[in-house]
Amino acid sequence: MIVLGIESSCDETGLAIYDYSKKKLIADELYSQVKLHKKYGGVVPELASREHIAKLNLLAKKIFKETGLSFEDIDCIAYTAMPGLVGALMVGATFAKTLGLIHNIDTIAVHHLEGHLLSPLLDHNSNIEYPFVALLVSGGHTQLFEVKEFGEYSLLGESIDDAAGEAFDKTTKLLGMGYPGGVEVANLADQATDKSKYILPRPMKNKPNLDFSFSGLKTAVLNTWYDEQDQSLENKANLCYALQNAAIDVLVSKCAKALQKTKNTRLVISGGVSANKLLRHQLDLLAKNREYQIFFPPMKYCTDNGAMIALAGAYRYVNGFKDSNLEINVKARSPL
């Protein structure tokens, strides 16, 4: 069973083909709009939608030409329907529905976060058994779930204000650095020369619940920098180091509590921030010390991509899900 996946929720245009029977990704194409939006310091929704319109058909032609496949080989077309930028989602959904109608292929709406949650399965060495705890951590979401079976997601905790990745994005904007923020913070943190210069708070780390809060951490960074007399590149690096350490300390602590609370021994990490090297290192240590199993997506599939949508769509399709009509129903916000 072969699925074409389409991702267009924000600023990445992704198409991929996944073979469910072989558990194998056949092809994957991605066009990133980062350079386009970088000069604006963030994603411009109208520009994002226009870029998806310009690139989707080109990527589709390329992916079929390179694989030698045709639409006759495709059993289902999966597309991101929620959450995301409504205009961008509409472009991808309309493209998917149109292809489905023309070629008489079933279509299926996929939740963007479900795609991220399942993305570690794109590593052919991953054999993840249920149940497990999952941390979704990105610029838009920071959430902990217990996953008992495919499609059974129990929310354990989430950020009550900003996502972890948003704290990184806002910090880079404050410091006059580039976009996206997570990469810039990590790169500059590696250049820190005085790792104890700044001590930042760990909001809600010691609270018994599994919720997060990163707004206060973001504000602490802002106040610290405004009070700093020497706003040099060296101190930018030191502050990024302190921010990264504080955020990851909280994330790791909450993951440990979630595993203890649910009595699980398997942890899945996904979302854009899952590419962070320090986060991976600290969670690997946690897993080693407490004999947990931990699963990350391949680095190239941490951020938005079509491969995770094709994979999630395949799992949904074999579980009996598919669109019942041509209605396009996309949502800017939607819980998993």
From Swiss-Prot:
Keyword Iron listed? The answer is yes
Where does the protein end up? Cytoplasm
Q: Which Pfam families match?
A: TsaD
Give the EC number(s) under which this enzyme is classified: 2.3.1.234
User: Record's superkingdom?
Assistant: Bacteria
Record keywords: Acyltransferase, Cytoplasm, Iron, Metal-binding, Transferase, tRNA processing
Q: Which Gene3D superfamilies match?
A: 3.30.420.40
PANTHER family per the record? Answer: TRNA N6-ADENOSINE THREONYLCARBAMOYLTRANSFERASE, TRNA N6-ADENOSINE THREONYLCARBAMOYLTRANSFERASE, MITOCHONDRIAL
Q: What is this protein called?
A: tRNA N6-adenosine threonylcarbamoyltransferase
Q: What is the organism of origin for this protein? A: Francisella tularensis subsp. holarctica (strain FTNF002-00 / FTA)
Gene this protein is translated from: tsaD
